[in-house]
Amino acid sequence: MMEIKLKNNILKQTLFLAFTITFLSCKNDTKNSGKGINDIITNDTNSSVINIEERSFPKETDLSEYPKTEFITTLESKINTSKNNVYCVTMLYAWNEVKNIVNEPFKIDSNFKHLTLLNNSSSFKDVLNPDEYIISSEIDGFNIKAKAEFKKSLTFQTELNSYKDGLKFNNEKVASFGITGIYNYEQLKIVSILYYKNDNNFIIKLHPKDSNHEIILFKSEKKFDKMNDINSEIIKLIVQGKEDKQNENIKWKYDILEEDEIIIPKFNFNIETIYKDLTGNTFDTKEKSYTIERAWQRTAFILDEKGAEIESEAEIEYYTEEEDPNKPKPKKMIFDKPFFIMLKKTKSQNPYFGLWVANTELMSKN
C-alpha cells in the first residue's frame, strides 16, 4: 500500500499502493481430507478469482521475523543468494494500475533505484490471464489506492509420497515429498525431467491438474544475480534437454527409472512486509508530485504433498571416480542444496511466482 503526497506549490495528493494478498498453493487432492487448501470453493466458471480457504495457511507473520528471507518486487531485482528470495507479480500489477490512474508522463528521481526498477519492468505482462487476478483502485479526495490480488491453487491429480524427516537440507532435517522409482504410474505422470546433467544440475516439472500452469524446480551449481537470469538459464537448458532426448545414448536421463529418486522440501508460509526503500520515494508529473507513503505486500505459499507417511531418511553418496557418462545410472534428484522454484503459465515465458531457496527458514519441519 502506498500513500503519495504533493509538495511545495504543486497540488498535493496521497497515493496508496496496496500490493496485497498473494496466495499460491500447490497441494494434492485427498479424498477424505475435508475442507482445506485442497478445496476449490466455487462452481462459477466466470469467477475472476478462485476462492481458497485461508485457514490452511499459517497466521500472517512480518518479514522481520525471517532474518534469512527477503522479498523482491521484480524479476530484474538483484538477489542475495545467501538468503531465500520471494517474488510475486502482484507488486508489478499494482504499480501498473497506479500508472493507469496517473495517466500522464511522470519523472522519477534517479536516486530512487527501487522505484525506477519497478517502473521499468515489463516482466509482468501476460504472465496471468485477466480472469486470474483482480486489480482495483479507489480515489478519495487526494488519496488514491491501488490494489492487486491473486489467489491460485494448483492441485495434483494423484498424491505423491510424503517423507517424514526424509530430507536434510544443508544438514537440517525438513519435511519432504516426491517419488521413488517407477512403482506408481499415476505419480510418474505428474513429474517430467526437462534437463539432467547430474544430480546437482537438473530441471524437473510438476504437472498440476490445471494444464495451463506448471511448477518448475531447478537445481544448479551455477551462480546467479537475478531471477530473470535464472529464468533465462532454465529456458536455455530446456532446449538442450529436448535435444538430449533425441540422442539414443543419453535419452535415459529423461526417463524416471526404478532406482531414481525425486525428493522436494515442503513449504508453508504467510509473510507480509512493508518496502521501506520505497517509502518516501517521489515521482512528478507536470502539475503534481506524488510521494509514496506505504508499499505493502503479503505472500502466502504452500508446496505440500499429503501422501503415505513413510519413515525413511535419504542418504546420498557422491563418487569421484570417472564413469561412462552414457551409461544409465540411478538419478538422485534431491533438493538438499540451494535451488529455484517458479510457477508459470505453460505458454508464458516469465513466471508469476519465484522462490530462490537458500535455507530452511520457509520449509515445513516435522
Q: How would you label these PLM feature ranges?
A:
Residues 13-16, 288-290:
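Generic hydrophobic alpha-helical membrane-segment signal
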